A protein has these predicted regions:
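N-terminal Rossmann-like or analogous alpha/beta NTP/dinucleotide-binding catalytic cores
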Residues: 1-94, 153, 182-200
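Active-site cores that bind ATP or allylic diphosphates and position pyrophosphate for catalysis
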Residues: 57, 73-74, 78-204
């Protein structure tokens, strides 16, 4: 949003950093000229000029797929052939209310058409986020499901793209809307599983 962009721009100017514009268009529906213009034109109108980019995630897919495959190879992710209907039916029958029920976690199914890849979220421990605005925020791993990192059509999700790009671009600070707070522990888990070292500092407006 323009609000988040403004806070990023002001932060960068205050601490003499680099303002990087990244277009998160891993979803094919968003990889359209009108979507790009809806991002860049308001920034230009506000005078929020970026130092690098724009970088389009849709043009960096190979990097993300490499990261996903490395997680599978390390046993940190697995193939899943469950569609939404199957998951909802099992949850209804069992009364499970935690989202995905880890049905395929130990099944060792092969890759195939329509098969997704899920991250194997640690069952113990927690993710601690020292949010620059909200202070210490804790997410228990037991409350985070095994989330999808590659869609059934073979494309990676933005969570993987963000982790890879943050590492590649040496991002030190991420300032964004509070609506993305619940995705942050997932990005941090991916960051750690990919052995990227210390993740960026986060601030959720």
């Amino acid at each position: 949003s323009a609000r988040s962009a403004l806070f990023n721009w002001l932060f960068i100017k205050r601490f003499q950093g680099i303002f990087i514009l990244r277009i998160e268009d891993t979803n094919a529906e968003l990889a359209q000229p009108e979507y790009y213009q809806a991002i860049t034109e308001p920034l230009e109108w506000l005078g929020l000029h970026w130092d690098e980019g724009p970088y389009y995630q849709s043009q960096r897919t190979e990097k993300y797929i490499e990261a996903v495959n490395s997680l599978v190879a390390k046993g940190r992710a697995y193939y899943c052939d469950c569609d939404r209907e199957k998951i909802e039916k099992r949850n209804k029958d069992s009364g499970f209310q935690g989202g995905y029920d880890q049905h395929c976690r130990e099944r060792n199914i092969p890759d195939g058409v329509g098969t997704t890849i899920r991250f194997k979220t640690p069952e113990l421990g927690s993710v601690e986020i020292n949010d620059l605005i909200r202070g210490q925020v804790t997410f228990k791993n037991s409350e985070l499901e095994d989330f999808v990192i590659r869609r059934g059509d073979g494309t990676p999700v933005f969570l993987v793209a963000n982790a890879v790009d943050d590492a590649d671009m040496a991002i030190t600070h991420v300032i964004r809307g509070e609506d993305l707070l619940n995705t942050t522990p997932k990005v941090i888990l991916l960051w750690e599983a990919l052995d990227y070292g210390t993740p960026p500092q986060y601030a959720h407006l």
